Regions:
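Conserved aromatic-histidine-acidic binding/catalytic patches
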Residues: 42, 46, 121-125, 203
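Mg2+/Mn2+-dependent nuclease catalytic core
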Residues: 84-191
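Hydrophobic/aromatic-lined pockets within catalytic cores
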Residues: 30-31, 118, 138-142, 201, ...
Length: 222
């Protein structure tokens, strides 16, 4: 296929898009073929509650290891990067929304709230997402939010643990929380995106993934 096309990436689509099935990801980005599945609304509710509670509070509420700063969790505008280039000088752009950031005295930390099991494995799952947010905000399109310098990144995980009380109408749910720091590495991210662009610019689509439900469904109906 022609290599002059400029692909736009969403930071959240790497882990559950490209990593899940390269065939389906290729069809989505190259041919516009997308199977849309509803996102459980309960996670959006949790996300909203978390952002509302932590907005304007101290970073120390997330982790004592973080430098003192104010949490900003009410920025709801889309973010857009300038035109970026991979290791083969192929252009691409990025766009998406952040959960929040911490405003320190001389720097910023990007944070993302996750309602998920608490495990260090989540660092690897969400590394490209957080690294992408940082790159977008340090190299924004004109008019998009610019934060500089962004020295730290991380995910703040919420894992429901138990119900302490109930009266028939409501209940108190406790959640364990954990901050996981993610290393900022722009070169590693560009290398990763270069690999994605190699797949998307190939004349041949990736093979179907035997562990992908959509690929297996396609086999049965074609």
């Amino acid at each position: 296929m022609a290599t002059d096309r400029i692909f736009n990436f969403s930071p959240s689509e790497f882990a559950f898009g490209f990593e899940s099935c390269q065939k389906c990801y290729y069809d989505k980005k190259v041919h516009g073929i997308v199977l849309r599945t509803p996102f459980p609304s309960i996670f959006s509710k949790f996300d909203s509650l978390q952002k509302n509670y932590y907005h304007t509070k101290s970073s120390k509420l997330i982790s004592q290891d973080l430098e003192e700063g104010e949490i900003v969790a009410n920025y709801n505008k889309m973010l857009y990067s300038e035109v970026l280039y991979d290791n083969k000088k192929r252009p691409f752009t990025m766009s998406g929304k952040i959960d929040g950031y911490i405003k320190h005295k001389d720097s910023f930390t990007v944070i993302d709230f996750k309602t998920t099991s608490i495990s260090e494995k989540k660092i690897y799952t969400y590394t490209t997402q957080l690294q992408s947010y940082a790159l977008m905000m340090q190299k924004p399109r004109k008019g998009s939010l610019k934060l500089e310098p962004i020295n730290r990144l991380g995910i703040f995980c919420f894992d429901p643990s138990n119900i302490s009380a109930t009266n028939g109408k409501d209940c108190s749910i406790y959640m364990n929380t954990k901050w996981f720091e993610i290393k900022r590495d722009d070169q590693s991210l560009i290398k990763y995106i270069s690999g994605i662009l190699e797949v998307l610019n190939s004349e041949e689509a990736p093979k179907e993934n035997p562990s992908c439900g959509i690929c297996n469904f396609r086999k049965k109906i074609i």
